[in-house]
């Protein structure tokens, strides 16, 4: 486990050193916000569907065992 941690720190350090001279990357902020909104709406829809299913199962008449 210690070797893995050392390797990870080494890779991060090397990437920081090699990228320090490169031009900063342009991040498409608008696209990230759009995807975030879509994912948020999808998660809300799943949450609402789950809640509706729970309420339905609670109110549904239960079958009696013989």
Curated annotation (Swiss-Prot):
A family per Pfam: Moricin
InterPro entries with a match to the protein in the record: Moricin_fam (IPR009456), Moricin_sf (IPR037043)
Signal among keywords: yes
Tissue: Expressed in fat body and to a lesser extent in hemocyte and Malpighian tubules.
Entry keyword set: Antibiotic, Antimicrobial, Immunity, Innate immunity, Secreted, Signal
Compartment annotation: Secreted
Gene Ontology BP terms: defense response to bacterium; innate immune response
GO CC annotation: extracellular region
Signal peptide: 1-24
Induction / repression: By bacterial infection.
Classification via Gene3D superfamilies: Moricin domain
The UniProt record lists the keyword Chaperone: no
Role, per record: Has antibacterial activity against Gram-positive and Gram-negative bacteria. Probably acts by disturbing membrane functions with its amphipathic structure.
Family: Belongs to the moricin family.
Name of this chain's protein: Moricin-1
Organism of derivation: Bombyx mori
Gene: MOR1
